[in-house]
């Protein structure tokens, strides 16, 4: 897929000014140049063009807010002076896997005053004697070269990754905000359903209590009936016994 089509797909119905992060890795550039990218991407902060066949960055538009630029695994051998004019606020630049052979090629990066991290892995320039020491002298604004500072301390989470995660967090917060708005809209209906369920539960409990009360009353009535029957039976036995005694008394008198 060529770069223009890829950019169109990545827009996903957004306008260029809405885009903060643009990843074009592994697409194809025309004649080794950037194409389809315009200065309408004025809010762009992160651009990745890994392995797209670039030989030059001359067609890069003016991107004042661009902070991180991924250009690794291309065929760039010079022309980096363009970056200072087009991306003046760049803080992270990855040129790993390009055809950069000497320090003079990266010297124009001195004008990128905000440049904090530079990666040149797998470039011939890294084979030069005192490579790291000389690059830090040439570009005093640098904090990290190939992921390590002057004291050979590793950048925390590759510093650049932390920046990209920050962009992702912003997107997540926006998505969460949309979900919360949706939940608020749906809340009244849900509340009605919950109230209805609570009313049904209360009615069910009341009916159960009435059933239990009715059963208890029936048991009491049955018990009362049994007691009455026993009393009647005892009373009848008493009368019968009395009659027998009276009859015995009359016989004795005779």
UniProtKB/Swiss-Prot annotation:
Entry annotated with the keyword Endoplasmic reticulum: yes
PROSITE patterns per the UniProt record, alphabetical: LRR
One CC-aspect GO term: cytoplasm
Role noted for this protein: Implicated in a number of cellular processes, including proliferation, differentiation, caspase-dependent and caspase-independent apoptosis, suppression of transformation (tumor suppressor), inhibition of protein phosphatase 2A, regulation of mRNA trafficking and stability, and inhibition of acetyltransferases as part of the INHAT (inhibitor of histone acetyltransferases) complex.
SMART domains the UniProt entry points to: LRRcap
Location relative to the cell: Nucleus; Cytoplasm; Endoplasmic reticulum
Any one GO molecular function term: histone binding
Post-translational modification: Phosphorylated on serine residues.
Family note: Belongs to the ANP32 family.
Annotated protein name in UniProt: Acidic leucine-rich nuclear phosphoprotein 32 family member A
Acidic residues bias: start-end ranges: 166-235
Regions that span the bilayer: none
């Amino acid at each position: 897929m060529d770069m223009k089509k890829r950019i169109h797909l990545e827009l996903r119905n957004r306008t260029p000014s809405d885009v903060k992060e643009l990843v074009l890795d592994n697409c194809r550039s025309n004649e080794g140049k950037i194409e389809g990218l315009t200065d309408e991407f004025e809010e762009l902060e992160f651009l990745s063009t890994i392995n797209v066949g670039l030989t030059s960055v001359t067609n890069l538009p003016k991107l004042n807010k661009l902070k991180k630029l991924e250009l690794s695994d291309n065929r760039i051998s010079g022309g980096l002076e363009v970056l200072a004019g087009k991306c003046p606020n760049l803080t992270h630049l990855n040129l790993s896997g390009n055809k950069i052979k000497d320090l003079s090629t990266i010297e124009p990066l001195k004008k990128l005053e905000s440049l904090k991290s530079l990666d040149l892995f797998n470039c011939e320039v890294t084979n030069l004697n005192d490579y790291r020491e000389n690059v830090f002298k040439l570009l005093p604004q640098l904090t990290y070269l190939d992921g390590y500072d002057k004291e050979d301390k590793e950048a925390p989470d590759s510093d650049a990754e932390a920046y990209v995660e920050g962009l992702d967090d912003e997107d997540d917060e926006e998505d969460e905000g949309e979900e919360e708005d949706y939940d608020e809209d749906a809340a009244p209906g849900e509340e009605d359903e919950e109230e209805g369920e609570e009313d049904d539960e209360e009615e069910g409990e009341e009916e159960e209590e009435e059933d239990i009360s009715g059963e208890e009353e029936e048991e009491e009535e049955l018990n009362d009936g049994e007691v009455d029957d026993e009393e009647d039976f005892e009373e009848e036995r008493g009368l019968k016994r009395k009659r027998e005694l009276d009859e015995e008394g009359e016989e004795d008198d005779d």
